[in-house]
Structure formats: structure tokens, C-alpha cells
Amino acid sequence: MKSILLIGLGRFGKHIALELNRMGHEVMAVDTVEDRVEALLPFVTNAQIGDSTNEDFLKSLGIRNYDVCIVAIGSDFQSSLETTSLLKELGAKKVVSRAARDVQAKFLLRNGADEVVYPERMLAKWTALRCP
């Protein structure tokens, strides 16, 4: 079982939280939208409403205590980039960040991401492989 910090609880982040819960991991879920946080409370170990671009807020989460930090913010690349950078500065062991385009991935990797995922590309490939 791993301890995972998940930031961003939109469609992608919500499904990550549910899958991590199914796998038995401890998940701390964070979003700025109260309804998203409340909807996932039954499925995560803990959840907080907060701004992940705020260094003091991130410090309060105890970043070094997590095995993996996932940045699943999809609608605001600037926030994703700032969050990724702050996580690494605060001692995150591993940061996995979401990107939609190659240029975003380059910025994320240069600013602290250990890995970048492309949800839309990954799903498109998975779907295409299932076509006869």
C-alpha cells in the first residue's frame, strides 16, 4: 500500500482516486472545488479543499510523507506547472503530472515532474488497440 497525494479532482482525478481506492492505497485528495472534495470523501483516506499553488497550504499537507504526488489539474496549466514545481521544492519523492500537449510535458519535466501522463492520448491508444 502506498500513500498518495492527488491534486485535482475533475473527471481524470476522480477516476484516479476511485482506482487507487480500489487498489487499497491511502489517498489524500485535494481540490479547490468543495463539491468535488465532498463527493470523494467516502473513497479516500482524507481530503482537503485548498489551493495547491499556495506554498503554505502544500506545506501543511506534509509533502515528504507521500510516496507519490499526482497533479491531475487539467483546466489550468499554469496552476499545474506551479503545483508541480512547488511539490518538488518541498521534497516530494515522485511527482506525476498531467499534460495535454508535448510543450506542456516539456515544461512540467523541466520544473519538477518525474513523469508526465497524457490521459487523452493514453485512452485513444487503448481504444484503438481494441478495434478489429
State each model region's role:
Residues 1-132:
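Cytosolic regulatory regions of ion transport systems
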